[in-house]
């Protein structure tokens, strides 16, 4: 009994407020009080209420909300609610960060994280069970293509749960940016139909005026072997390179190449031989664009790591050997310059395909979606792991739905301009899905498996390890707050259902590739959650942020090749130009590269989310410590980069987005 002071906070986005009346209830340990239709929430406002309650509620457990329709039904975005009880009762915090729609009743538990086994009086059991039942009806697994990890159900973004849709600022930025690049393409692209590329320098016609500093450097130095090798370490796709343990079986050296054999074996023995194998592309059916056949290769590149840290190519094989056919041609740095250049261009085009489909789309976007859908279906909002992960799912489901409908759909961007479009891209995604391993999503294991832990010139490796360690410490501290021992992990039924939902359902039974079906210890839980957060943040950033830098100069990363791989070394500049994309294709590549790679004005950096899901002081202190460690790493990278010829910023915490949003 007594007065309760209630503060209701509405979101800041354009349509966050509502003209409808909202009814509130306070649910305590002993009783429930209906406060009536007290509220008409306005955008960006904090509404204060002071109400006499004649009942003894006891400790507050839940705030209930129901929006009543007026003549017009308008949704309401509630950030959070605080309630100050009478007497010595402290202030209770009820996080919401979701839309209140229609006539549904929303239950907001008090923000202290609570595992189901810690609720010994079963005060919250019915709320968490009802929440999960409702969520499983809304967050349903869908299916896009056979053999691919599962997406959220829904044909378009309008089919998605309201809480997973873009806010108005994001939606407006996305729509205006897309309209601008399409307008530029329509205006400038008309001239491309009457223009021909006569020299490599002619690609300057489509080179963006608002280029990045690194893009300009790539344009000026793209022919250099050192920059070619550098990209495997620190470029748009640092996920393919590995140290050679033996000479690849596919590398067939014809008679007369004994010197090359000796050099390769020397580097192999010294531990300085590396390889980039694009066998994933072997046999992929190439696209036909405007009635013209495009072409795909599956190269192998052997590289040597020099004492100065430079990675230099030694030999390029553009196709694997075929039974009954002569050994494929091998290209060497000593070959005629145009032949060697064309071989490197073929590698760069192949890397474009593998990067965009395997490293970026599958391992970044689609994997993050599996984690987010499984979490929404399996962990209630009271669960500490839900509270820990929730900020890292913002906008992921909508951006992925848009990608499936516009980028890799029938008549999407890949079909219109990329050599692996019109079905080849799906084939690649299916092959890559079958190769997904748990270790490959954990940088300490992945970099060890690929032999990159001690490669000092791999700035990606150094920064990925550092970021993983910071996230791991953050997760570890959170886990220690809520799980006192391994037994508590094993006996958390919601946690075990979540783990199985990720591995067995979302990833189509990936336990045979190392993904866990259960979590048996705090250490195992920490590793799994760290993998989830790193995937949604650093993993995506490392393969997303470099697109403008490395693909703005078309010859350095052509989206398609219009001629088959060369069968002789008698190559002219005209042969190269005939193979590279025409100006229309090049401008289309630049158009979607600029759109996807642009700076996000509503970007939230890693760990900088404003949403407070935890009311626990200990958890808030852990987040603050995480932010401090990220700030230290960010400053150290800034200082390091100032002395580098080619700065590496893709895993700088201030550049890493808190979730997959573009």
From Swiss-Prot:
Its EC number is 1.13.11.-, 1.13.11.31. Keywords: Cytoplasm, Dioxygenase, Fatty acid metabolism, Iron, Lipid metabolism, Metal-binding, Oxidoreductase. Disulfide bonds: none annotated. Fe cation binds at residues 360, 365, 540, 544, 662. SUPFAM superfamilies: Lipase/lipooxygenase domain (PLAT/LH2 domain) (SSF49723), Lipoxigenase (SSF48484). The keyword Nucleus does not apply. It is found in: Cytoplasm. It catalyses: (5Z,8Z,11Z,14Z)-eicosatetraenoate + O2 = (12S)-hydroperoxy-(5Z,8Z,10E,14Z)-eicosatetraenoate; 1-O-methyl-(9Z,12Z)-octadecadienoate + O2 = 1-O-methyl-(13S)-hydroperoxy-(9Z,11E)-octadecadienoate; (8Z,11Z,14Z)-eicosatrienoate + O2 = (12S)-hydroperoxy-(8Z,10E,14Z)-eicosatrienoate; (5Z,8Z,11Z)-eicosatrienoate + O2 = (12S)-hydroperoxy-(5Z,8Z,10E)-eicosatrienoate. Residues 114-662 form the Lipoxygenase domain. Its cofactor is Fe cation. Pfam families: Lipoxygenase (PF00305), PLAT (PF01477). One of its GO terms (cellular component) is plasma membrane. Binds 1 Fe cation per subunit. InterPro entries: LipOase, LipOase_C, LipOase_C_sf, LipOase_CS, LipOase_Fe_BS, LipOase_mml, PLAT/LH2_dom, PLAT/LH2_dom_sf. Residues 2-114 form the PLAT domain. Belongs to the lipoxygenase family. This is Polyunsaturated fatty acid (12S)/(13S)-lipoxygenase, epidermal-type. The lineage of its organism: Eukaryota, Metazoa, Chordata, Craniata, Vertebrata.
């Amino acid at each position: 009994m007594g007065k309760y002071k209630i503060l209701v906070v509405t979101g800041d986005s354009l349509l966050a407020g509502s003209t409808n009346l909202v009814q509130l209830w306070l649910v305590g340990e002993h009783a429930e009080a209906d406060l009536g239709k007290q509220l008409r929430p306005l955008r960006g406002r904090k509404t204060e209420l002071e109400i006499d309650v004649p009942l003894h509620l006891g400790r507050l457990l839940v705030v209930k909300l129901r929006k009543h329709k007026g003549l017009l039904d308008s949704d309401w975005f509630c950030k959070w609610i605080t309630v100050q009880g009478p007497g010595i009762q402290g202030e209770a915090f009820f996080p919401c960060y979701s839309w209140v729609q229609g006539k549904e009743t929303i239950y907001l538990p008090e923000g202290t994280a609570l595992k189901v086994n810690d609720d010994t009086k079963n005060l919250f059991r019915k709320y968490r069970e009802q929440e999960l039942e409702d969520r499983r009806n809304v967050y349903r697994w869908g299916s896009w293509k056979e053999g691919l990890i599962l997406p959220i159900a829904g044909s378009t973004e309008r089919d998605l749960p309201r809480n997973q849709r873009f806010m108005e600022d994001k939606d407006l930025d996305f729509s205006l940016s897309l309209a601008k690049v399409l307008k530029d393409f329509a205006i400038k692209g008309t001239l491309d139909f009457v223009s021909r590329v006569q020299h490599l320098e002619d690609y300057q016609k489509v080179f963006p005026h608002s280029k990045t500093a690194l893009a300009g450097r790539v344009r000026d130095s793209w022919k250099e072997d050192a920059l070619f090798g550098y990209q495997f370490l620190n470029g748009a796709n640092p996920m393919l390179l590995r140290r050679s343990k033996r000479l690849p079986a596919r590398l067939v050296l014809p008679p007369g190449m004994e010197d090359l054999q000796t050099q390769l074996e020397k580097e192999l023995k010294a531990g300085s031989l590396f390889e980039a194998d694009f066998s994933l592309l072997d046999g992929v059916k190439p696209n036909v664009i405007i009635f013209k056949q495009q072409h795909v290769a599956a190269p192998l590149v052997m590289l040597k790591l020099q004492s100065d840290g430079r990675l230099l190519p030694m030999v390029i094989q553009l196709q694997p050997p075929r039974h009954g056919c002569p050994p494929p041609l091998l290209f060497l740095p000593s070959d005629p310059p145009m032949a060697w250049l064309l071989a490197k261009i073929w590698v760069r085009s192949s890397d474009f395909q593998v990067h965009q489909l395997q490293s970026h789309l599958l391992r970044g976007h689609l994997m993050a979606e599996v984690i987010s859908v499984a979490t929404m279906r399996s962990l209630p909002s009271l669960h500490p792991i839900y509270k820990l992960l929730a900020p890292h799912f913002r906008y992921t489901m909508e951006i992925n739905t848009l990608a499936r409908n516009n980028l890799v759909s029938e008549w999407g961007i890949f079909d219109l301009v990329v050599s692996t479009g019109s079905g080849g891209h799906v084939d690649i995604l299916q092959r890559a899905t079958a190769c997904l391993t748990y270790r490959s999503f954990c940088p300490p294991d992945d970099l060890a498996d690929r032999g990159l832990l001690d490669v000092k010139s791999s700035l990606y490796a150094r920064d990925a390890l550092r970021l993983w360690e910071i996230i791991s410490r953050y997760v570890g501290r959170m886990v220690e707050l809520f799980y006192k021992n391994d037994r508590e992990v094993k006996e958390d039924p919601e946690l075990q259902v979540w783990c199985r939902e990720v591995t067995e359902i979302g990833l189509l039974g990936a336990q045979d590739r190392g993904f866990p079906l259960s979590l048996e210890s705090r250490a195992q839980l920490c590793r799994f959650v760290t993998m989830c957060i790193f995937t949604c943040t650093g993993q995506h950033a490392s393969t997303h942020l470099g697109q403008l830098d490395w693909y703005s100069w078309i010859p350095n990363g052509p989206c398609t090749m219009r001629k088959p791989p060369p069968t002789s070394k008698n190559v002219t500049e005209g042969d190269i130009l005939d193979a590279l994309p025409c100006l229309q294709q090049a401008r289309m590549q630049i158009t979607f590269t600029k759109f996807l790679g642009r700076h996000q004005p509503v970007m939230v950096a890693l760990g900088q989310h404003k949403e407070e899901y935890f009311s626990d002081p200990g958890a808030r202190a852990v987040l603050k410590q995480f932010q401090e460690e990220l700030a230290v790493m960010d400053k150290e990278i800034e200082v390091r980069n100032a002395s580098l010829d080619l700065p590496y910023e893709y895993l700088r915490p201030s550049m890493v987005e808190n979730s997959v949003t573009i």
